[in-house]
Amino acid sequence: MLTYASGLQDNGWSYAFSVSTRQGGNSYVNGVYYNAFGYFAAVEKQFNSQHRLALSILGAPTERGAQQASTQEVYDLVGNNYYNPNWGWLNGKRVNARVRSYHEPITMLNYTFDINDRSQLNVATSVRFGQNGYSALTWYGGPDPRPDYYRYLPSFYNNTYVGAQLYEAWMGNTNNIRHINWDNLYHINQSQEENPTYGAGHRAINMIEERHADQIDWNLYTQFSHIFRDNSKINGGLNLRRNRTEYYSEVKDLLGGDYWVDVDKFAERDMGGMNPILYQNNMEYYDKYGHAQAVKKGDKYSYDYYGNIINARAWAQYSRNFGNFGVNLGGE
């Protein structure tokens, strides 16, 4: 961590900044890592004995690989409870399918008015914005890519030759059976036949998506305080909040494929593929072109909608001491 603060200068200005990082690699749980940075900067101007204005900015861009729970059968096979099915080897490196990444910086502006030695007014506003995503494997029609899928475990083939072979493979991690086979996922995608409906290229049936909850959060806070001559005190204020959160899924990595067809695979399965209208995610695109959209890296797909919050709150509090006793009244 590196921090510096100037203190109050003769011209009324003061400023401070700080930067830091936190790094973590493979430890008890394979495939889990932590890369985070933090920053803070603030500047304040004291115009005179009554008026002060301060601006602050802070944030912490972070990326971390996640662990996922498995079954007791798998923990027994690998010999510990630290097993993580989210990762596999690709080009000699550990690659985790589930990664949490976020960066939501906050900007704050604060004004202080010392009206007199008994009264003060504070007005502050802040904005928080940025991205918050969580990646995961998804697939369409092909074999389940999760290494600990129940059909890939010995118990599914109990008391059979296949079950015995799987048991030995899991015990010895033969061909990295405990991990995601990234090479195979690339091979499956690149082996798909081209479909002229969606243009040139291979349709990905395995990919990594990233599910987002991206916020814009605005707050306004005002507070007035006054001390009466009998030392009783009154505080009051008004708080306003406006939040808009966009929820959507994004194509993060096509794993060697060229596009992903944006349909609801569960609705398509349940409807038997009979009426394509019933399993479209984007009806506007379907109505215009007559087929599902072929989305590529960075495109939104599956769902995209907003959640909105508007809050307003006013409050007041009165307090007074009578010797060893005190009275407090408040409401909002």
Report the location of each language-model feature:
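Outer-membrane beta-barrel transmembrane strands
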Residues: 93-136, 203-249, 297-326
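Membrane-embedded beta-strand positions of outer-membrane beta-barrel proteins
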Residues: 15-19, 55-57, 123-125, 236-238, ...
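Acidic/polar loop-and-plug regions of large Gram-negative outer-membrane beta-barrel proteins
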Residues: 44-46, 52-112, 133-210, 275-295
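Glycine- and small hydrophobic-enriched segments that form the cores of compact globular domains
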Residues: 248-309, 313-319
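Short, intrinsically disordered, charge-balanced linker/junction segments flanking boundaries
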Residues: 5, 324, 329-332
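Short, cationic motifs built from Arg/Lys/His that form the positively charged side of catalytic pockets
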Residues: 16, 40, 315, 330-332
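Short acidic-glycine motifs
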Residues: 16, 107, 217, 254-255
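Transmembrane beta-barrel wall of Gram-negative outer-membrane proteins
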Residues: 1-24, 28-67, 106-115
